[in-house]
Structure formats: C-alpha cells, structure tokens
C-alpha cells in the first residue's frame, strides 16, 4: 500500500552534495516585451514604402525611346527552304520594284543601294 507522507530519503551515493552546496537560483530576468507586434508593423511599413518608391521610380523614371536607322547590311544568312539552299541573290531593278508594287508586294528601300548592298531598317531602343 502507498502512504502519502512516506518518501524515502535519497542515499548519499546518489546525491552526495545535497547538504554541501545550496541550490543555485536563476537570476531575475526582466519580463520580455510583448509578442513582437511593433517590430512586425515596422517591417511591413518599410516594405510598403519600398514598394511605393519602386512604383514611382518606374512611372516617372527615364522612358525608353525607339528610333529607326537605315543601315546597309548583307542579305540574311542562308537558310534551307524545303531542303533547297538559296544561293543566287540579285538586286531588284526599278522594273522589278515597279512590278512588285503593282502586285502589292513592294518592300520600301528594296531598290539598288550604294556599293551593291541593300539597305535595311533596324529598330534601336535606348534610354
């Protein structure tokens, strides 16, 4: 049977320092400051301000401008077309350009140019 007041005394072999040293007490720590809600609110406010600054910088910042430049270029690289390589190039004469314009296939600046090169129009994007 179990008695409520009876607790056996620990042996000296198990706890030999029981009577020699007093138990240490933890130093009193000041209570911690809440659940961190003010810090979380400050972090969220910083990110919101950063997002607003980014939106304003993109909206009012430098804009991209597009321009066109006519550059003299070689014909495009040879590509196989249904297994046939296009290797014979010739410049269109004024009569060829006139025929294509009547058929609705006229390409601007497709006539002969300086040094036998055909000019092409390339877009340039800059700040």
UniProtKB/Swiss-Prot annotation:
Question: What is the recorded membrane topology of this protein?
Answer: Single-pass membrane protein
Entry's transmembrane regions? 38-58
- Glycosylated where? 15
Q: Which UniProt keywords apply?
A: Glycoprotein, Membrane, Transmembrane, Transmembrane helix
Name the gene for this chain: Smim33
List where this protein forms a coiled coil.
none
Keyword Glycoprotein assigned: yes
Q: Which GO terms describe its cellular component?
A: membrane
Query: Where is this gene product found?
Result: Membrane
Q: Main localization of the protein?
A: membrane
List the InterPro entries hit by this protein, alphabetically. Answer: SMIM33
Name its species.
Mus musculus (Mouse)
**Organism domain of life:** Eukaryota
Which PANTHER family does this chain map to? SMALL INTEGRAL MEMBRANE PROTEIN 33 (PTHR37873:SF1)
Question: Keyword Phosphoprotein: yes or no?
Answer: no
The name under which this protein is listed is Small integral membrane protein 33
């Amino acid at each position: 049977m179990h008695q409520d007041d009876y607790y056996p005394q620990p042996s000296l072999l198990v706890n030999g320092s029981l009577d020699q040293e007093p138990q240490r007490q933890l130093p009193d720590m000041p209570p911690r400051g809440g659940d961190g809600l003010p810090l979380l609110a400050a972090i969220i406010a910083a990110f919101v301000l950063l997002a607003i600054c980014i939106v304003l910088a993109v909206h009012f910042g430098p804009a991209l401008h597009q321009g066109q430049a006519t550059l003299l270029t070689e014909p495009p690289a040879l590509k196989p077309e249904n297994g046939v390589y296009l290797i014979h190039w010739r410049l269109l004469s004024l009569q060829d350009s006139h025929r294509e314009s009547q058929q609705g296939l006229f390409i601007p600046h497709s006539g002969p140019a300086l040094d036998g090169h055909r000019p092409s129009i390339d877009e340039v994007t800059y700040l």
